[in-house]
C-alpha cells in the first residue's frame, strides 16, 4: 500500500470514528424539555484562540502582519503579493466556529464596503458637472442643501435664559463699539485682505429683508457677488458669447456701497474668467470646446455655456486657492515664515489611529451665528472710514450718520439701491467712466488697487468701529436677537473653549469690562453679538496668529473655512483636471517654489498684464503693506527677489511686420538696441560677482562685439564643417536606434523630444564641456532630458519671457538651474585650465564622441585669451550654450513639421531621394529644403528698444517710434512677406539665401548660423532617408500649437498643462530598418 493510499485510508477511518462518536453522544442525551416543540436547544460553541492557532502557519501570520501594517500606516497594498487572496485562504482555513475567523471575515467585508462611497458623492452627466446658478445640486442627493433662498442653519442650541429686555442696540454701540482713536493693525495687514473678506462674507450671507431666516445667496464659495445668486442675476452678467462675462462688471449691487477696492478685486476676477475662457477655447482640449456656427443656435448655446461654466469652475478654484494660500496663511501669520504649510481642507485623508477621516462633498448650509462672526468693521482703515463718511453724506445730506434713526437709515439705503440700474454695465462705480468696449481704464483700476495695498487696515477689538457704522451695527444686533441665538459663552462651549467667568476675561480693559457688567449683569448673559467683537484681540504670533482677531472669532473662522471648502463637491471630489481641463487645473495651482505657495499674483497679473512687473511685491503679497513686507522678506532673505517699485504702465510693444523694416531695424545698432542684457546679468551673477554684461547679446557696446568675435573664432576652427556634419549624422542615428520602437510592427519615435532636442544637447555638452550623463560618460550629472530642460528654461528666460503671469516662476527657476550648471561647468573648465589638453580628460568626459577633442580645444582657445575661467563660463560659455540648444531644436522640428503636413508632404519623396544620394549637390538642395521649411513654420520674434526717435516704414505705413519704446521685429510675418518671398506659402529652392529671416540680421545675427545650417540639414538628411516617413496617427503625430500675438506660435507641453515656447512632442512613423551607426 502506497504512502498516499495509507494516508487516505487513515483519513477515512478518522472520519468514520468521528461520526460514530457523534452517534454515541446523541444516544446518551436526555429527552428535550426546554422547548415546547420537542426540539433541543443548541448552543454554538466558539473555538478558543489556541484551537484557531493550530490552523495558522507562518505564512498566515505574515498575512496578518501585512494587513495590520497597511491598516495602521495607510500604505497601499501591493496586490502582486496576493494579500487579498491570502486573507481569503486564512479565513477559509479557520474552523467555522472560529471567532478570529469571523472577525477577519467581517473586517474583510468592511474593507470592501468602505472601498466605495455610500451613497456616491460624484456623478456623471451635464446636470452634475457644473455649478447651478443658485448653488443647488452641490450634494446631488440633497440638492437643496446650501441653495440660495433656503433658511440659515443654527449651530448652537440656545439654553441660557435671557432677559426679554436686553440693552438698547444703539446704547451698546456707544458703550462698547464706537471708535475712540484709530489703531493700526499690529501685523500691518492691508485693506486688500479685508476686501477679500468682504467678498467672502457677501458670497455666503445675504439676509432676506422680508424673511430674515432666509439667505438669498448660496452657502458655498462660488463667487456669487460676481456671478449672481440665481439664474436671473447670472444671465444679466453674461454676454452669451464665447463663455464671457460682460467686461468689468459684477452681479451684486451691495458692493457698490463699499470702498471701491472691493469692486476692483471683483473686476479682477471678472477679467480672470474672461482670460480663462479665451484660453480654453483656443486650446480646445480633446475637442471639448469646438466652436460651431453661430447660426446653429442650440449648438452655439451649448458651446457658450460649456465655456462659461468651466470658466466659472476655474475662477472659483483660483478664488479658493487665494483664500487658502494667501488669506488663511496671512491670518495664521505663516507668511512671516519660510514654511509652505497651509490649512488646506482639500487634503486627502484616510482613516487612521486618531479616528475616521473627515467626510467631504457633503454640502454645506451656513449658520446664522457665522453671519455675525464676520462683521469686522473695527478693521476699517482711516482712508476707508473717510470714504464711507463721504458716501453717507451723499445718501443723507446735512445729517450726522451716527445720529440717523434706524428707520431713516433703512429708507435711505432703500432709495439708494432702487436708483441703481438692473443692467450691471450701467451702474456707477467709483466715479469711473467706461470705454467704448465697456471696460474701465486700467490706470484707474490699478491706482485703486495699488493704494489699497499700501493702506494699512485697523485693529480688531472693542471701541474701534467707526461711528459712521452706528446704524449698521445696531441693525446687526437687532437681527441677531431676531434669530434667537445662543449666548457668547454657549457659542464658546460649542467649540470646546472655556466659558468666561468674569467680564474681565472677556475684555481686560477696565472700562469695557465695567460697561459689560452694567449692561449684562453676568458673563453668561452676554449676547453672541456684539460679544464676539468686544472680546480682547489675540496678540501676534508667527506662525499662529496673524489676523489678531478676537479670541472666539479666531477659532470659529477656521472651522467655518474647513466646512465651506471640504463640504463643497466642486472644491473637492470634482476639483480635477477632467472637470477643469489640464491647462486650467495647472494654471491655478500653487507652486512650492513661488511665494511659499501664495497665488494672488496669478489674479493680479492676468487682470493687469501691462502695469505690474512679474516680480512686483504689489502682485505677489498684496495682503500686507509693502513696507512691512520689506521687513518680512528681508528677514527671510528673499527681499531681493522682488521689485518694490509701484506699478507703472508699460505699453505693449509695437510689432514691425515687413521684411524690409525688420532687416533695417536689426541692422541699425545705433537706433535700436538689444534688450537682453539685464536678464543675462541676472542669471549669470555668481557669488555676488557680476557676469554676463560683456556677452555678445547683452548690449551694443564694444565689449559685446569683442565677445562675438572671440566666440566665433573658438567655434569655427579648421574643418569645423566636416566635424559638425559627422557628429550630427552620428548622434541622430544613435538617438533613432536608442529611442525608436515598434508598435504592432510599425516603427515609431518622438522626433521632437527624443531626436531634435537631444541631438542639440549632445552637441553643446561636447563643445562646451557640460556635465551630461550618458552611457559613455556615466559620471555626468544631468541626463539628456534634464539638460535640455535647463537649456530651454535659460533660453526662455532670456529671449521669450513674454507671459507676465509665468515670468517670476520662470526667472527664478532659470537662475537656480543656471547657477547649478555653471558651477559644474566651471569645474570642467578649471580642470582644462590647470592641465591643458589631456587625453585622459577627453576619454573620461566624452568617450567615443567625435566632437570631444573639438570641445576641449575650443575651451583651451578661450583660455588662451587670458580671460579668467569664471568669466569664460559665466559671461560667454553658458549664455552661448543657452542660446543654441532650444533654438536649433525648434528650427529643425518646425521645418520637419511642415514637410509632414498635408501641403508639405508632396516634397518628401524628393527629400528622401536626395538624402540617399550623399553628394554635395544633393546636400545643398537639402539645405534649401530645410531653410524653406523653417521659413514657413518659423516662430521667431526679436525685441529691440528705440534709442532715439525715428520713423519706420512698415508695409506702406509710416510708424513714428519714440525713445524708450519697445518694438518686436516679427520674423514670422517677415518670413512670409510676399515682396521678399513671392508665393510665400510655396517651397522654392532658388530663393536668395541671404534673405532668410529666422536667424536674424545684422550685428546680432545668430552666431551659430553656419553651424546651425550644417547641423540641421544633416539631421534632415538622416530623417529624410527613412522610407514612407509620416506622422503617427491622431494628435500624437502633430505639434500642439496655437497662434499667439503677431501670429507667433505658442506650443504646449505633451500633457497640455502649460504653454511652451518650443515644440515638445511629435511622433513619426516610417517603413524599413534603420541604417547601422558608423563609429
UniProtKB/Swiss-Prot annotation:
Q: Where is the active site?
A: 374
Cofactor(s) named in the record: heme b
Classification from the root reads: Eukaryota, Fungi, Dikarya, Ascomycota, Pezizomycotina
Q: Assembly and interactions? A: Homotetramer.
Species this protein is from: Aspergillus fumigatus (strain CBS 144.89 / FGSC A1163 / CEA10)
Function field: Bifunctional heme-containing enzyme that oxidizes linoleic acid to (8R,9Z,12Z)-8-hydroperoxyoctadeca-9,12-dienoate (within the N-terminal heme peroxidase domain), which is subsequently isomerized to (5S,8R,9Z,12Z)-5,8-dihydroxyoctadeca-9,12-dienoate (within the C-terminal P450 heme thiolate domain). Oxidized unsaturated fatty acids, so-called oxylipins, derived from endogenous fatty acids, influence the development of the asexual conidiophores and sexual cleistothecia and regulate the secondary metabolism.
- PANTHER family registered for this protein in UniProt: PROSTAGLANDIN G/H SYNTHASE, PSI-PRODUCING OXYGENASE A
Which superkingdom? Answer: Eukaryota
One GO biological process this protein is involved in is:
response to oxidative stress
Which positions does UniProt annotate for heme b binding? Answer: 202, 377
The EC number(s) attached to this protein equal 1.13.11.60, 5.4.4.5
UniProt name for this protein: Psi-producing oxygenase A
| A Pfam family recorded for this sequence | An_peroxidase
Query: Which family does the record claim for this protein?
Result: Belongs to the peroxidase family.
Per its record, what are the GO molecular function terms? Answer: heme binding; iron ion binding; isomerase activity; linoleate 8R-lipoxygenase activity; monooxygenase activity; oxidoreductase activity, acting on paired donors, with incorporation or reduction of molecular oxygen; peroxidase activity
Alphabetical keyword list: Dioxygenase, Heme, Iron, Isomerase, Metal-binding, Multifunctional enzyme, Oxidoreductase, Peroxidase, Virulence
Mark the transmembrane ranges: none
Q: Where is this region: Linoleate 8R-lipoxygenase?
A: 105-446
Residue numbers spanned by region 9,12-octadecadienoate 8-hydroperoxide 8R-isomerase: 654-1079
